[in-house]
Amino acid sequence: MNTTPVHALTDIDGGIAVDPAPRLAGPPVFGGPGNDAFDLAPVRSTGREMLRFDFPGVSIGAAHYEEGPTGATVIHIPAGARTAVDARGGAVGLSGGYDFNHAICLAGGASYGLEAGAGVSGALLERLEYRTGFAEAQLVSSAVIYDFSARSTAVYPDKALGRAALEFAVPGEFPQGRAGAGMSASAGKVDWDRTEITGQGAAFRRLGDVRILAVVVPNPVGVIMDRAGTVVRGNYDAQTGVRRHPVFDYQEAFAEQVPPVTEAGNTTISAIVTNVRMSPVELNQFAKQVHSSMHRGIQPFHTDMDGDTLFAVTTDEIDLPTTPGSSRGRLSVNATALGAIASEVMWDAVLEAGK
């Protein structure tokens, strides 16, 4: 009997291989020169490679400060889109949280990095030529990761960087890896000596008229897992060359009556964007379903030392069929089925970030 895990979208994607080479972050400094110590100039992030996607009305831009390194990633939807927010964990860094947004800003810099979202808001107001009618308000929600532990500066994404990320936004492209908000993201913080750098990741699927785009910046205390149950990023022991699941460290700590040394300062921020129209209840459940599914690719997840936020966004362009279209009937095409597929797309994005 074949027990090899099968990708739920195996007919679309043959699978994602993660480079096994270690990317150790090194011990944290927790301080250093800040923004005023440098002549900062935003740099367009190009990352490891560019994901090409076909989603009209959605543009993405990423910018960073090399001096950090830290950055911001902006998902711009000029027409605006309904949004549901699912935030969990003990240290959520979130601003806005609106149920309708024109842009989502993901950034490093912990709470200080929320300033990048203000830069996006200001730039959108300028594009409106400072018209302030209520119906014209440009809404921006932001979420941040704590990325100071993987670098030796106190540089954070400010208004200028958020503005630059918006200016760099283009349709159909997303920079994978160390780019934008993922410049100094890391995973597997059971022990700082075993922490590894991740990045930002995205994946896209089109099924008929249905479009799904997943974007994620994994910066968890946990490790990144592939579909075979293998730890592919985080908690890497340089002496043995082995990555292991944190549960083994926790078991040893309890057996030895020594408190686990899990480090604070962790967050995974993400967005799942679709063109499928859903009711407010369905959209909220869609957000929860996809966010919960990420436990498969990040373990542990949603801990009291994390602050995880997912934005579920719909451009409301198409309706799912309301009558059975196959022998599987209604169960094959509904918001729950959409969430199941989107969950696999998000797992692909997590693996791309760790790649």
From Swiss-Prot:
It comes from the Bacteria. Keywords: Hydrolase, Nylon degradation. GO terms for biological process: nylon catabolic process. The active site is at 267 (nucleophile). Pathway: Xenobiotic degradation; nylon-6 oligomer degradation. It catalyses: [N-(6-aminohexanoyl)]n + H2O = [N-(6-aminohexanoyl)]n-x + [N-(6-aminohexanoyl)]x. Its EC number is 3.5.1.117. Expressed as an inactive precursor that is cleaved autocatalytically at Asn266/Thr267 to generate an active enzyme composed of an alpha subunit and a beta subunit. It is an enzyme of class 3 (hydrolase). InterPro entries: ArgJ-like_dom_sf, Peptidase_S58_DmpA. GO terms for molecular function: aminopeptidase activity. Optimum pH is 7.0-8.5. Heterotetramer composed of 4 alpha/beta heterodimers. PANTHER family: BLR5678 PROTEIN, D-AMINOPEPTIDASE. Involved in the degradation of nylon-6 oligomers. Degrades cyclic and linear oligomers of 6-aminohexanoate (Ahx) with a degree of polymerization greater than three by an endo-type mode. Cannot use Ahx cyclic dimer or the Ahx linear dimer. Belongs to the peptidase S58 family. This is 6-aminohexanoate-oligomer endohydrolase.
